[in-house]
Amino acid sequence: MSPGAFRVALLPLFLLVCVTQQKPLQNWEQASPGENAHSSLGLSGAGEEGVFDLQMFLENMKVDFLRSLNLSGIPSQDKTRAEPPQYMIDLYNRYTTDKSSTPASNIVRSFSVEDAISTAATEDFPFQKHILIFNISIPRHEQITRAELRLYVSCQNDVDSTHGLEGSMVVYDVLEDSETWDQATGTKTFLVSQDIRDEGWETLEVSSAVKRWVRADSTTNKNKLEVTVQSHRESCDTLDISVPPGSKNLPFFVVFSNDRSNGTKETRLELKEMIGHEQETMLVKTAKNAYQVAGESQEEEGLDGYTAVGPLLARRKRSTGASSHCQKTSLRVNFEDIGWDSWIIAPKEYDAYECKGGCFFPLADDVTPTKHAIVQTLVHLKFPTKVGKACCVPTKLSPISILYKDDMGVPTLKYHYEGMSVAECGCR
């Protein structure tokens, strides 16, 4: 199993340690992802096998957490100041409150217009014309499923809105071979047209243009759309989209995509393989140590090790209540407390849960003990000072939806971000 997958699988541990220490996450830029397998797991010292460096472990987990969100580091404050479109916040709220609402894609991004050149309508050309400039960037391992252009349409002159609106608009993809970015003569491709009946947000499907832009992956050319708007009603001779700088209703793109890297499935399979290997190794070591200790104990004390099981078990049952057994308990994670509130938009906090309590003999079915956990518990009863109890650990993790800003300040909604909350606890 790769060290990166291991650390991502243990993300809840990283969160829990940071919260319990009540310290902000600092020096992210100093964490280097280029560690070897030994150092990235927090094992330090060539001659000190098994020495665990917690600080190094946490620093490398920070790097992998950011990498799993396609972030190279903590987004700068300057790029995270702009407020995300209300649409993205509404989308997040819908997915988190309505469990039956499932998006077609697991990643949603919004890209605001960067610039616009506008031309007013004339008698010879009765259209409002706009060249909209965007900067669309999607990781290559993601597959775009849909792209929408959202425009706010309104009547720019004072009229009685009760009469409604009547007009149309057409959207073109401005090709890269145009001589200047604000000219589109003869270098545009028709994308979509739409009738206008009411004032408000209009959604136009423009997936083909965005897919072309991403395939081109050009850093020298801007992503350009031409939008023309025409009014068909005399009572509103200036029907137009909202483009003035500072407007709350500026045009923006919404791009839906799926992560094709399949990292969740790969991580789960590798984690399962690693756990199985570790359990087999620990079982062999535990049995070997138990036999050695048993021989020493019987020679020195002349006792049968199993005679202590009954009284020990009785005392253990009397001293432990139901609440001290392995179970899932609440653990609130507040992103402001750990220094992430500048780039994580929502949730502000969530319940990560944690596993607390002991694994006492006999192990109940609700803690889903493995064969190794059962054997380790039995050996612990016989040699409590030599062999530790089985551990109460997460056995199943659940996802949360997270709305955050990436390196470029792009609002990104990741639906079902895996491994962020404990779903079940057990003895391992």
From Swiss-Prot:
<dbReference type="GO" id="GO:0006879">
    <property type="term" value="P:intracellular iron ion homeostasis"/>
</dbReference>
<dbReference type="GO" id="GO:0032757">
    <property type="term" value="P:positive regulation of interleukin-8 production"/>
</dbReference>
<dbReference type="GO" id="GO:0030509">
    <property type="term" value="P:BMP signaling pathway"/>
</dbReference>
<feature type="glycosylation site" description="N-linked (GlcNAc...) asparagine">
    <location>
        <position position="262"/>
    </location>
</feature>
<keyword id="KW-0165">Cleavage on pair of basic residues</keyword>
<dbReference type="GO" id="GO:0043539">
    <property type="term" value="F:protein serine/threonine kinase activator activity"/>
</dbReference>
<dbReference type="GO" id="GO:0030182">
    <property type="term" value="P:neuron differentiation"/>
</dbReference>
<dbReference type="InterPro" id="IPR001839">
    <property type="entry name" value="TGF-b_C"/>
</dbReference>
<keyword id="KW-0964">Secreted</keyword>
<feature type="disulfide bond">
    <location>
        <begin position="326"/>
        <end position="392"/>
    </location>
</feature>
<feature type="region of interest" description="Interaction with ENG">
    <location>
        <begin position="401"/>
        <end position="415"/>
    </location>
</feature>
<protein>
    <recommendedName>
        <fullName>Growth/differentiation factor 2</fullName>
    </recommendedName>
</protein>
<dbReference type="GO" id="GO:1903348">
    <property type="term" value="P:positive regulation of bicellular tight junction assembly"/>
</dbReference>
<dbReference type="InterPro" id="IPR015615">
    <property type="entry name" value="TGF-beta-rel"/>
</dbReference>
<dbReference type="Pfam" id="PF00019">
    <property type="entry name" value="TGF_beta"/>
</dbReference>
<dbReference type="InterPro" id="IPR029034">
    <property type="entry name" value="Cystine-knot_cytokine"/>
</dbReference>
<dbReference type="GO" id="GO:0045747">
    <property type="term" value="P:positive regulation of Notch signaling pathway"/>
</dbReference>
<dbReference type="GO" id="GO:0045944">
    <property type="term" value="P:positive regulation of transcription by RNA polymerase II"/>
</dbReference>
<dbReference type="Pfam" id="PF00688">
    <property type="entry name" value="TGFb_propeptide"/>
</dbReference>
<comment type="similarity">
    <text>Belongs to the TGF-beta family.</text>
</comment>
<dbReference type="GO" id="GO:0010596">
    <property type="term" value="P:negative regulation of endothelial cell migration"/>
</dbReference>
<keyword id="KW-0325">Glycoprotein</keyword>
<dbReference type="GO" id="GO:0005125">
    <property type="term" value="F:cytokine activity"/>
</dbReference>
<dbReference type="GO" id="GO:0030513">
    <property type="term" value="P:positive regulation of BMP signaling pathway"/>
</dbReference>
<dbReference type="GO" id="GO:0006366">
    <property type="term" value="P:transcription by RNA polymerase II"/>
</dbReference>
<feature type="disulfide bond">
    <location>
        <begin position="359"/>
        <end position="427"/>
    </location>
</feature>
<keyword id="KW-1015">Disulfide bond</keyword>
<dbReference type="GO" id="GO:0061036">
    <property type="term" value="P:positive regulation of cartilage development"/>
</dbReference>
<feature type="signal peptide">
    <location>
        <begin position="1"/>
        <end position="22"/>
    </location>
</feature>
<feature type="disulfide bond">
    <location>
        <begin position="155"/>
        <end position="236"/>
    </location>
</feature>
<dbReference type="GO" id="GO:0006006">
    <property type="term" value="P:glucose metabolic process"/>
</dbReference>
<feature type="propeptide">
    <location>
        <begin position="23"/>
        <end position="318"/>
    </location>
</feature>
<dbReference type="GO" id="GO:0060391">
    <property type="term" value="P:positive regulation of SMAD protein signal transduction"/>
</dbReference>
<keyword id="KW-0732">Signal</keyword>
<comment type="function">
    <text>Potent circulating inhibitor of angiogenesis. Signals through the type I activin receptor ACVRL1 but not other Alks. Signaling through SMAD1 in endothelial cells requires TGF-beta coreceptor endoglin/ENG.</text>
</comment>
<dbReference type="GO" id="GO:0001569">
    <property type="term" value="P:branching involved in blood vessel morphogenesis"/>
</dbReference>
<keyword id="KW-0339">Growth factor</keyword>
<dbReference type="InterPro" id="IPR001111">
    <property type="entry name" value="TGF-b_propeptide"/>
</dbReference>
<keyword id="KW-0037">Angiogenesis</keyword>
<dbReference type="GO" id="GO:0001937">
    <property type="term" value="P:negative regulation of endothelial cell proliferation"/>
</dbReference>
<feature type="disulfide bond">
    <location>
        <begin position="355"/>
        <end position="425"/>
    </location>
</feature>
<dbReference type="GO" id="GO:0001649">
    <property type="term" value="P:osteoblast differentiation"/>
</dbReference>
